[in-house]
Regions:
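Flexible "stalk/tail and boundary" regions
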Residues: 1-14, 18-19, 27-85, 89, ...
Length: 151
């Protein structure tokens, strides 16, 4: 942990077993803590949050007007698919069938740290996404770091 801020970074490849379990590297487990929340992410991957970081998102969502169509749609997908879990003794997480289907996971997975969350991708979708976006990374970085960012 970096102060009060969780710092998840790195890329790992593991296989989903026949019971829907996936080994999460110990460096990620140590940052997330005993309990985690897994849910549908964006771009057809899964997001994994520490309980405290998920609570921050829920608190933010609770301030939004549920009468807005986009708010309801996001809550249904993001909150509706979320589940609170604990790592098993082997450091694995359980991924439910609906989440496996959503993320197109068959067996091979890529687990990446993305600051305050993990992303779990099917290997095929991750490679496709990275290939499609690699040429845009320079302009994306320029846009991000020109948004009132001071190092």
């Amino acid at each position: 942990k970096w102060g009060v801020f969780i710092m998840l970074m790195g890329e790992f490849h593991h296989n989903l077993d026949e019971k829907g379990r996936l080994i999460i590297p110990s460096k990620f487990r140590n940052e997330l803590g005993e309990k985690y929340v897994i849910t549908k992410g964006l771009d057809k991957c899964l997001f994994v949050y520490s309980l405290s970081n998920f609570e921050k998102i829920v608190n933010k969502l609770s301030t939004l007007q549920f009468t807005r169509k986009n708010v309801r749609a996001f809550e249904r997908s993001f909150i509706g698919s979320a589940s609170l879990n604990e790592f098993d003794k082997q450091g694995r997480i359980n991924i439910t069938s609906p989440l496996v289907h959503y993320a197109n996971i068959t067996k091979e997975c890529v687990i990446i740290g993305a600051l305050e969350r993990l992303e779990i991708w099917s290997l095929e979708d991750y490679n496709k996404y990275m290939k499609e976006n690699e040429e845009d990374l320079a302009s994306i970085a320029e846009d991000i770091f020109n948004m009132n960012y001071e190092a």
